[in-house]
Amino acid sequence: MAYPVIEAPYGLKPVNLIGGQVFAGSTRMYNIQYGYATDIFYGDFVVLSRGNVTRASVSTGTGLNQTVGIFLGCTFTSPVTKQKQFSQYWPASTTAGDCQAYVLDDPDTMFKAVVCSATTVVASAAMAMIGTNMSAINNTGSTATGNSANAVLAPTATAATTTLPLRLVGLVQESAISVSATGSSSSTTITLTGTGLPSAIPIGTDVAYIAANGQIIQTGSFVTAAAAAAATSVTINAAIAVPGSIVAIPSASTIVFTQYPEVLVKFNQALHGYYSATGA
């Protein structure tokens, strides 16, 4: 069975813990204040305000009120039916005084997330981004599904700043999509021959090529501008860097472009409130 095509972001989904720790999927329950007027979706960042959970818009990771974790649903007594209700999301302005949010608050959690170039436009991460810091995109989730639409921002260069909220730990191989074309590179430009790209590729697409012995060579470079199907020129973030002082893809090489729409990330230490000496 083929892995589903990734069509839109879904917030942060917990998958395991770093360092081989046992992941139980446990959550901590926090209060949501009566009438809180902002939707909170499954997979959203949340912070604490006077002991209550509120939705956080996290892009740079700066500020004193750091995240307490990721929202994973809630329970409350419906003001309409007077029955206990379990909900994928918190509906804004619900007049329930007993709401409890399920929050995954372990700062060592690794999450799966979708990479986007802007808002909800699915893009790609690349091998060169592993270990770097990533920004987040704040999107409004869906009241139909209850799921978040937050995403990881595809960079046009490897990030050097330490103020970004997420650290990219790995690429999700199962949803990767690869295409190939014949060509070469010079500095930050790949020139393709023949009919060019067989299909469009987004920002962040990983670049590799096939060696004479049939092995794949990772270049350490990635695409910085989306390229359409049949394009014969592709812009990359930097000249390739291959052992042996190789800085260009040889002429008539098979160049492999791999899109990784999903990544594994964790909170940067400065983002999570448990690692901060300043309380909420």
Q: Where in this protein do the model-derived segments appear?
A:
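Surface-exposed, low-hydrophobicity beta-strand/loop segments enriched in small/polar/acidic residues
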Residues: 1-182, 206-221, 235-280
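Disulfide-braced loops of extracellular cysteine-rich modules
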Residues: 197-200
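Ser/Thr- and Asn-enriched, surface-exposed coil loops between beta-strands
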Residues: 182-195, 226-235
